[in-house]
A protein has these predicted regions:
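Solvent-exposed, acidic/flexible segments
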Residues: 42, 60, 82, 86, ...
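Short, Lys/Arg-rich, polar N-terminal cytosolic tail immediately upstream
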Residues: 1-5, 146
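Extracellular/periplasmic juxtamembrane segments that couple receptor/chemosensory ectodomains to their
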Residues: 207, 219-240
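Extracytoplasmic/periplasmic ligand-binding sensor regions of membrane-associated signaling proteins
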Residues: 97-107, 111-201, 228
Length: 240
């Protein structure tokens, strides 16, 4: 006959082992749930990144075609200098805006960096963009340029830009055709959902780390950069 004390010891040991088994199973379930949550978060992030990439690509392709129409219109009428003598350019840009669902503000800039035509209300006097990075790039020979986020001098709101160099009949620099784009798409796809999407920050950054578009971006953050961060440098080193 087993002594009562030994029986109690066996029962205590069994209870302890059972409790440890329960804790082990619970820990395993928590680990599996954690791994599953990570996998789902990773998949959702990849889906968002692909969606943003495709949208950005299509937006820039559409903008490129529309800017091509502006360049053709400009050259057909004798160049950028000739456009300042009539109001046809502003009307053409306004019509182009109505035909486009993605583009918000069209500009034609002369070779000195001053506005010749704007798709919105024409400024009382020409606005100079000669100090902008994109203008300097085109004057130096760049055919196209995707600009970082900025506060528009005409729209006075956060935009990112895509522009093309306008050549004259001899191929020399005659000005710039540009479209300013609002990053509304990022705000739309980052609306809060049951998956805690409100904690996600969506953005597009240039090769040097300058922000092009980002959710929650404020005017005092448009010059921010990720260029010196280890994460950006690691991503930049991955072959495309």
């Amino acid at each position: 006959m087993t002594p009562v004390r030994d029986m109690r010891s066996v029962l205590y040991a069994t209870a302890i082992l059972f409790a440890l088994a329960i804790l082990g199973l619970r820990g395993a379930f928590i680990w599996f749930e954690y791994r599953d949550a990570l996998d789902r978060a990773r998949a959702a992030t990849q889906d968002l990144a692909l969606l943003m990439e495709e949208y950005t690509k299509r937006t820039l392709e559409t903008s490129d075609l529309l800017l091509g129409e502006i360049i053709a219109f400009t050259r057909l009428r004798g160049g950028v200098g000739a456009l300042s003598e009539t109001g046809q350019a502003r009307q053409f840009l306004a019509d182009l805006t109505r035909r486009s669902s993605a583009s918000d503000l069209f500009l034609i800039i002369d070779k000195e960096g001053n506005t010749v035509a704007v798709s919105t209300v024409q400024p009382a006097s020409p606005v100079s963009f000669s100090d902008r990075t994109w203008f300097k790039a085109h004057r130096a020979g760049a055919e196209t340029f995707v600009g970082a986020a900025l506060v528009g001098r005409i729209a006075n709101e956060i935009l990112y830009t895509y522009s093309r160099r306008i050549p004259d009949l001899n191929g020399e620099f005659d000005g710039v055709a540009q479209v300013g784009l609002r990053p509304t798409f990022l705000q739309e796809i980052s609306r809060p959902t049951e998956s805690d999407a409100e904690d996600a920050t969506l953005g597009i950054w240039g090769r040097e780390g300058r922000v092009i578009a980002r959710t929650g971006l404020t005017q005092d953050q448009v010059s921010s950069s990720l260029g010196q961060t280890s994460l950006f440098n690691e991503l930049a080193s991955v072959p495309s």
